[in-house]
Amino acid sequence: MSETILQVKNLKKHYMVGRKGLFGEKEYVKSVDGVSFELHRGETLAIVGESGCGKSTTVKSLIRVTEPTSGEVILKGQDFLKLKGEELKKARRNIKMIFQDPYSSLNPRMTVRDIIGEPADIEHCYKNEEERENLILDTMEMVGLNKDFADRYPHEFSGGQRQRIGIARAIILKPEIIICDEPVSALDVSVQAKIINLLKELQQKLNISYIFISHDLGVVKHIADRVMVMYRGHVVEEGTRDEIFSHPKHDYTKLLLKIGRAHV
């Protein structure tokens, strides 16, 4: 088995929604309730389930877009949830995200050059403008974007091209982990296949680990090494792609496979 690079232990995210009476106990919605899993180097772990199952809240909590209620997220021997300041900034360099909507996730006032280069600008990881330019153009080439596109703006591109820009932005610092939040659901089927193949190529070149959130089981079957099924904030089943698709154990997993698609 390959190296474990991320361990999530008993992750919880509870939202207070009220009280039982004026002075009664607090009432909570348990969006994520005791989720644990591991991610191995160079693999793709897919998280699937219907809308409201907790899959998106899980990844938002583990990268602290929303602060979790409790749990541990062990990255490189450190609990990511306890890091602050420069330590947190440094750790975040190793976890990046590709978003569902390739248009709304890109600043319309920025050129492709500046969108892709922004993470490098924030980290100051180049010596001069020439090195910055080479880094950006090399990254564009890696994701199949023509270097002549560098001075254009997001509205000038198709959905697939915009997603390539988003992918370039995510990989420019060579992170170890990328969270893919429904990265192809807004794209045409023919474009979906090209983006999935690109993600797989980049994974082989850069040894990236993906956490892949999706409601499309067809896409999951094509890209995932392992699959984690969530229902009402809990992990109900986890296994290899073949185990989940060919020999599901939990009734909820069987239902998802039967309908062929877990609706968002």
Spell out what each predicted region is.
Residues 238-239, 247:
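ABC ATPase "signature
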Residues 71-79:
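Conserved ABC transporter NBD signature motif
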Residues 153-157, 161:
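Conserved ABC ATPase signature
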Residues 172-176:
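A short, proline-enriched helix->beta-strand linker immediately N-terminal to the Walker B motif
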Residues 79, 130-148, 257:
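Conserved ABC ATPase "signature" region
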Residues 63:
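Helix-to-loop junction immediately C-terminal to a conserved catalytic motif
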